[in-house]
Amino acid sequence: MDLEFGRFPIFSILEDMLEAPEEQTEKTRNNPSRAYMRDAKAMAATPADVIEHPDAYVFAVDMPGIKGDEIQVQIENENVLVVSGKRQRDNKENEGVKFVRMERRMGKFMRKFQLPDNADLEKISAACNDGVLKVTIPKLPPPEPKKPKTIQVQVA
């Protein structure tokens, strides 16, 4: 007797899944939607700190193993900082060499940060040192307080 959920025989479905050929399992493991999910996780897994100083904002983004020329820093929509790039694995193919374990994420990554209104977008600087990208955005000086306007009262 097969347990049914709605109109679906649960045990038969599970049995079919367990007996699925390995190549079918491999196809589903590498399908495009899974690749998109891996990319989305990689983007979210790029750690960053945002530090506010009295005169600037500093964004420290971990970039281990990435060369400075593989990193892009941009401003989009007038107030969004975008840090993007691509981690690439060495293409050295040695015969008989294979990966036993691959934990480091490879591929494209992107982080976006909403900038505050007082960020000086004309004076942004970025430097990558020891695998950490630091983007420094100075703060605009606070606007001068408006002086009260005195209106002359006319006497009639």
From Swiss-Prot:
GO MF term list: unfolded protein binding
Family label: Belongs to the small heat shock protein (HSP20) family.
Name of this chain's protein: 17.7 kDa class II heat shock protein
Key words of the record: Cytoplasm, Stress response
Gene: HSP17.7
Subunit structure: May form oligomeric structures.
Keyword Cytoplasm: yes
UniProt cross-references to SUPFAM superfamilies, sorted A to Z: HSP20-like chaperones
Pfam families: HSP20
GO cellular component: cytosol
Cellular localisation: Cytoplasm
GO BP, sorted A to Z: cellular response to hypoxia; hyperosmotic response; protein folding
sHSP domain boundaries: 39-156
Annotated signal peptide: none
